[in-house]
Amino acid sequence: MTDVRSIDLFHVLVPLRKSIKHASFERASSDNLIVRVTLRDGTVGHGEGLPRPYVTGETIDSTFASLVKLDLPRTLEDVAGLESLVRRLVGFVLPEAQADPRGMAGNAARCALELALLDAFARREGRSVGEAIPWMGSFGEMLNARPGPVRYSGAITAESPGKEIRSALKMRIYGFAQVKVKVGVPGQDDPARLARLRRILGRGMDIRIDANEAWSAGEVVERVRPLLPSRPSVLEQPVPHEEAEALATLRPMLGVPVMLDESLCGYPDAERAVALGTADLLNVRLSKCGGIGPSLKIMDLARRSGLGVQLGCHPGETGLLSAAGRQVACRVRGIRFLEGSYDRHVLARNLIREDITFGYGGRARPLPGVGLGVNVDPDALAALTVAHREVRYD
């Protein structure tokens, strides 16, 4: 017997305020998976994942299929409360992930389910999901004794010069300390763009660049060299994942620290990056990495291996994943870069009632309240739902 009475799976189509463009993809809306867990006492929790075929190989259909066939009563047998749930989830992987050498198949589905379960069980006990983080592993020095304030980065996507200038001016006026700039989009003059943005953002701004697999291993050194005068702090995913092992040789030649993103989707990816020396930093995102527990495990490996960490986000995340990211960010020390909580700046409509968008300078505080700290707006969920499937465990 399990305390879970049912799960509901929702395919929601989230509209964006404007199209988001980078070297790998362009989107004006986001296909998101929402999982709703209902416990036998009526307590409800929600979670979110963003299946992306070009990231973890998942689609909405594959996540539905995975979660519908999951034997959740057996998985959660004898789980009675939040702490026992967390202990059980530590070793929980979907069958498709077990067969995947990169450990990423099913990660968006696992993330959505994990968050919904944590949200429901934490709400029932009047706790925050953040309180459960210390139970997810022996992370020691990585965790703060108490949740603290955080500061998010800004982001400038590849647009027309006029729009990029306006974005940069907004970033500077709004007091951001860090900004990410997308590079590698065909037809863009990246050296000129970056020099122009550096002039506007100022000498003190931390500017990192994200190529989204734009360049081949054979050309990356030449592509990066003219960008160095603008002093980027980090270069994210410069080559396709299939060529990422070449970074072990190329990384010392690039003149800028390298962060892995598309090549960092599961714990085996992180182990490989450490063993081969292909990265200086790892970009951990809850959805692509399988949820809070697996993400913390990767972050801990990075810390023990001397690598930096970015806690990132996927374009189109609603307030559910924003809240989950905040719960993690407020409790983990030493996060080099933090992305997320862009909600009202990116989404034309959100799924949650609260506005948890970061404030001036990207600053944000821990979320009060139980569960993830946010509440789903049922009208918004109904309006954005494209498909729905209920699984009952009577």
Located regions from the model:
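Structured beta-strand/loop patches that form or line metal/cofactor-binding pockets in enzymes
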Residues: 1-57, 344-349, 391
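C-terminal extensions of enzymes
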Residues: 7, 345-394
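Conserved, mostly hydrophobic/aromatic
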Residues: 35, 42, 113, 126, ...
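Metal-dependent enolase-superfamily TIM-barrel catalytic cores that perform enediolate-based chemistry
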Residues: 131-254
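Shared catalytic-loop signature of beta/alpha-barrel
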Residues: 242-257, 264-363
